[in-house]
């Protein structure tokens, strides 16, 4: 078939790779001048099944309300008139029960574990590299209370297949010597040995080049999707700034813009943008920086080591489609990073960035055929798009081919 994929981020590019590997003629439409220049450009760098716990939980409402007035928190809510945000919030709150938290987290973990294996298989099959480190990730807590509360979620994930190690201070510093200076400030943590880190933009750049050169995938960069030409129960063409693109099937993988396009054609797709901030800094003294990825769970800041660079990531800000940033947005992030890794970097040399996560109310992405016979979704991966993208792409390719997916599809296949 001729398949058109909308979006060349990590999700869309992974889908294009697997579809082309199945023998389809694939065209990818991307508004930016290169792949992975939107949501996938500068994420936390974590491939983290250990971060599969859904955002919606019984504690989420309290955190949400605190985010209205305390902008030093990792969660920020900017009040504005936005009917879509109100509707999304109500659906989010309906997911904030213990039962939904567990169900959503279990689905996310299933896909995340599968996707991690898919990433490694792609790397082995294609020979591409992306500053990857396969040394695990540390999730640590500064107080005994947060440690006791936080480890409950990890224990639940462990019950469903995630290998973890609950670690005290001594073991934590053994795993990450870079944290020796703050050992007494940390109560303990969780080590997920199968988690890993890597530069998603570099991965996508290399995968797109491979897909183009070896599999014949055609990328239309600098091309904006303007709409869909619907005839009856099928999409006849994708209308773009460069003219119509016809084909036998269409895949929507447009990140936070997916919901905007879907709603125009009667598709219930509650994807809402949640802004995040990252800083990428060259390490001045590599011996003082981290050797593996980590997350300060009390400060809500994640970090990864990407070659000789340090990637910092923080904040979940509900502010619509605003992608702007200013130096003060990074103040808390830099303060936390200086505390953890003093002398490792010079923040004046940081490359600052802000992007939008495509969040579903339950934190679970949607994959599969939607409303029209030849229209498919692969979107809504939220804060773990890098983690889930390759598994989603392979899962989607199986659905398109009519094959039985390699993982249980319950909770993943679109039903709207």
UniProtKB/Swiss-Prot annotation:
Membrane-spanning intervals of the chain: none
Gene it is expressed from: dadA2
Annotated GO MF terms: D-amino-acid dehydrogenase activity
GO biological process: D-alanine catabolic process
Keyword Metal-binding in annotation: no
Protein role: Oxidative deamination of D-amino acids.
Cystines in this chain: none
Top-level EC class as recorded in UniProt: oxidoreductase
Organism name: Mesorhizobium japonicum (strain LMG 29417 / CECT 9101 / MAFF 303099)
Keywords in alphabetical order: FAD, Flavoprotein, Oxidoreductase
Protein name: D-amino acid dehydrogenase 2
Keyword Disulfide bond listed: no
Catalytic activity field: a D-alpha-amino acid + A + H2O = a 2-oxocarboxylate + AH2 + NH4(+)
Listed cofactors: FAD
GO CC annotation terms, alphabetical: cytoplasm; plasma membrane
Record EC number: 1.4.99.-
Family of this protein: Belongs to the DadA oxidoreductase family.
Positions with a binding annotation for FAD: 3-17
């Amino acid at each position: 078939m001729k398949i058109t994929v909308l979006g060349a981020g990590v999700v869309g590019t992974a889908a294009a790779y697997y579809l082309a590997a199945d023998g389809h003629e694939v065209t990818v439409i991307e508004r930016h001048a290169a792949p992975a220049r939107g949501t996938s450009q500068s994420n936390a760098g974590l491939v983290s099944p250990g971060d599969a716990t859904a955002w919606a939980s019984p504690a989420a409402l309290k955190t949400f309300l605190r985010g209205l007035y305390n902008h030093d928190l990792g969660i920020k809510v900017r009040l504005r008139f936005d009917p879509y945000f109100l509707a999304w919030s109500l659906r989010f709150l309906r997911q904030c029960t213990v039962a939904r938290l567990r169900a959503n987290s279990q689905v996310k973990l299933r896909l995340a574990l599968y996707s991690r294996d898919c990433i490694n298989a792609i790397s082995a099959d294609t020979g591409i590299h992306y500053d990857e480190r396969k040394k695990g990730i540390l999730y640590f807590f500064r107080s005994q209370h947060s440690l006791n509360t936080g480890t409950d979620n990890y224990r639940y994930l462990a019950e469903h297949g995630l290998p973890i190690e609950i670690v005290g201070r001594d073991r934590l510093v053994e795993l990450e010597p870079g944290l020796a200076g703050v050992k007494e400030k940390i109560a303990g943590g969780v080590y997920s040995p199968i988690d890993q880190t890597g530069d998603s933009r570099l991965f996508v750049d290399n995968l797109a080049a491979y897909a183009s050169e070896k599999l014949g995938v055609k990328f239309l960069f600098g091309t904006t999707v303007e709409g869909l030409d619907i005839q009856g129960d099928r999409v006849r063409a994708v209308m773009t700034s460069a003219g119509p693109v016809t084909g036998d099937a269409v895949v929507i993988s447009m990140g936070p813009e997916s919901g905007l396009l879907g709603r125009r054609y009667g598709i219930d797709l509650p994807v809402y943008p949640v802004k995040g901030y990252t800083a990428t800094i060259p390490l001045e003294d590599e011996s003082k920086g981290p050797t593996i990825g980590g997350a300060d769970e009390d400060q809500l800041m994640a970090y990864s080591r990407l070659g000789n660079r340090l990637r910092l990531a923080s904040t979940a800000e509900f502010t619509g489609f605003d992608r702007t940033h200013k130096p003060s947005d990074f103040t808390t992030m830099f303060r936390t990073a200086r505390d953890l890794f003093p002398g490792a970097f010079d923040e004046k040399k940081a490359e600052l960035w802000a992007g939008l996560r495509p969040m579903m109310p339950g934190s679970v992405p949607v994959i599969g055929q939607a409303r029209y016979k030849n229209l498919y979704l692969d979107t809504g991966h939220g804060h773990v798009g890098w983690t889930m993208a390759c598994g989603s792409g392979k899962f989607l390719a199986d659905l398109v081919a009519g094959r039985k997916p390699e993982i249980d599809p319950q909770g993943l296949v679109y039903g709207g």
